[in-house]
């Protein structure tokens, strides 16, 4: 009984402590930090967003309206980007694969910001195949895998990200008639129960990866399907059926991304996924700075070359 009373008092103290307002607390002053952000896309005009990172009491960054933004291609000056409002600066240069791009930002009263990146090539997807019953989801349902074959160069450090739009529909036949159907569709950005060596090497289920351990010029990536989806069933009851016809489609999108884009996305993952030292109940979280390749400032200067392969249609009897 005595032990119960002590535990009750401790709980009461903990609750009252959590509800007590901290008086005379002042947030430390945060000097606005110049920030350069840009993700150049192959085939589109170059651009850059210049802002100032603010303190915790600011919801949005403050736009920089008076910057001089100079753009370089392969080490040669190309143009001065024009300000279009809200800190957005745009140019007329079209981003092209395998070219080096650099950006210099001059802001009165601050050190000059500088960043550079290389535009990757678009990935070449050579084949897409569906492997039935590759794994099972949390509810014990059989899930297919999407096998994506693509070309790469093992002699260069290359980086990729992918997403898969898919729809799977099952039609249950009885006496030659469809009596029930089920389906699910959506977009996949991760792989469940990951057993692909490249994804395992990344230590993440996200479809963000490098060719670090690939030794051949072509690789087949195995993505065990799972996605945020809309599902339905035309009937809520179950009867005997003669056969099932599976229909649907799979559309793979894959992008080549610059090294800076890859490391930034990786740092985002680390920020969003708690580690072993994180205890949200106690307010404990591991400090982490997002990756930045901007000299004298914050932000990321990256490049992406997206592609979408042909749609694969499914029409098979199981």
Please provide the spans of the model-predicted regions.
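A sequence/structural signal for flexible, mid-protein segments enriched
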Residues: 19-318
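Sec-dependent N-terminal signal peptides
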Residues: 4-13
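C-terminal motif of bacterial Sec signal peptides marking the signal peptidase cleavage site
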Residues: 15-17
């Amino acid at each position: 009984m005595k032990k119960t009373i002590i535990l009750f008092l401790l709980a009461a103290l903990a609750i009252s402590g959590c509800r007590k307002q901290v008086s005379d607390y002042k947030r430390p002053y945060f000097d606005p930090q110049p920030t350069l952000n840009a993700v150049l896309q192959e085939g589109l005009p170059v651009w850059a967003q210049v802002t100032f990172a603010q303190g915790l009491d600011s919801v949005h960054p403050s736009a920089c309206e008076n910057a001089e933004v100079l753009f370089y291609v392969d080490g040669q000056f190309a143009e001065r980007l024009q300000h279009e409002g809200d800190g957005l600066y745009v140019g007329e240069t079209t981003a092209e694969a395998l070219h080096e791009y650099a950006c210099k930002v001059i802001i009165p009263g601050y050190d000059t910001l500088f960043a550079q990146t290389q535009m990757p090539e678009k990935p070449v997807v050579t084949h897409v195949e569906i492997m039935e019953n590759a794994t099972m989801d949390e509810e014990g349902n059989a899930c297919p895998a999407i096998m994506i074959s693509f070309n790469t160069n093992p002699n260069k450090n290359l980086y990729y990200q992918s997403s898969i739009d898919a729809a799977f529909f099952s039609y249950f036949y009885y006496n030659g008639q469809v009596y029930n159907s089920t389906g699910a569709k959506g977009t996949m950005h991760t792989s469940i129960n990951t057993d692909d060596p490249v994804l395992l090497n990344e230590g993440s289920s996200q479809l963000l990866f490098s060719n670090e351990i690939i030794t051949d010029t072509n690789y087949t990536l195995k993505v065990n399907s799972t996605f945020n989806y809309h599902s339905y069933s035309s009937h809520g009851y179950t009867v005997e059926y003669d056969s099932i016809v599976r229909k649907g489609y799979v559309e793979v999108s894959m992008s080549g991304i610059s090294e800076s884009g890859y490391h930034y996305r990786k740092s985002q993952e680390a920020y969003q996924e708690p580690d072993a030292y994180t205890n949200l109940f106690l307010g404990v979280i591991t400090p982490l700075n997002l990756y930045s390749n901007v000299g004298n400032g914050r932000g990321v200067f990256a490049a992406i070359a997206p592609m979408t392969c042909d749609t694969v249609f499914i029409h098979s009897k199981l």
